[in-house]
């Protein structure tokens, strides 16, 4: 699973996801892509599950690019522990995804295979997504 090798700080504030993606919203590598339609926190497990679903359907033909990286530590206190006594330990890593953010890109396969592979991948994610295709010039 994806996570940073090292960070400046161990824990982070929760924060809010406001506005739309100002960068990483266009196809940069592949011919087809999966674009987020709503804001949410996508954890590393979801990204990995989506990547597996996409590559499995493509039967390892073509290429997959993951355009998001889980860099936000999400903390949780153990069950049945009273409030207070400090912030909980880091449970998992997540990525704050804004609407318009390109999450996955694929290339080297037909449109039908790409569409179905990305549909299977999007089922693993906690954000609404849509299929996008590069416009031929």
From Swiss-Prot:
Gene Ontology biological-process entries: translation
CDD domains referenced in this protein's UniProt entry, alphabetically: Ribosomal_L16_L10e (cd01433)
Cross-referenced InterPro entries: Ribosomal_uL16 (IPR047873), Ribosomal_uL16_bact-type (IPR000114), Ribosomal_uL16_CS (IPR020798), Ribosomal_uL16_dom (IPR016180), Ribosomal_uL16_sf (IPR036920)
Gene Ontology terms for molecular function: rRNA binding; structural constituent of ribosome; tRNA binding
Domain of life from the UniProt record: Bacteria
Pfam families: Ribosomal_L16
Swiss-Prot/TrEMBL keywords: Ribonucleoprotein, Ribosomal protein, RNA-binding, rRNA-binding, tRNA-binding
One GO CC term, this protein: cytosolic large ribosomal subunit
Gene3D superfamilies, per the entry: Ribosomal protein L10e/L16 (3.90.1170.10)
UniProt similarity note: Belongs to the universal ribosomal protein uL16 family.
UniProt function note: Binds 23S rRNA and is also seen to make contacts with the A and possibly P site tRNAs.
Subunit structure: Part of the 50S ribosomal subunit.
Official protein name in the record: Large ribosomal subunit protein uL16
Lineage: Bacteria, Pseudomonadati, Pseudomonadota, Alphaproteobacteria, Hyphomicrobiales
Gene name per UniProt: rplP
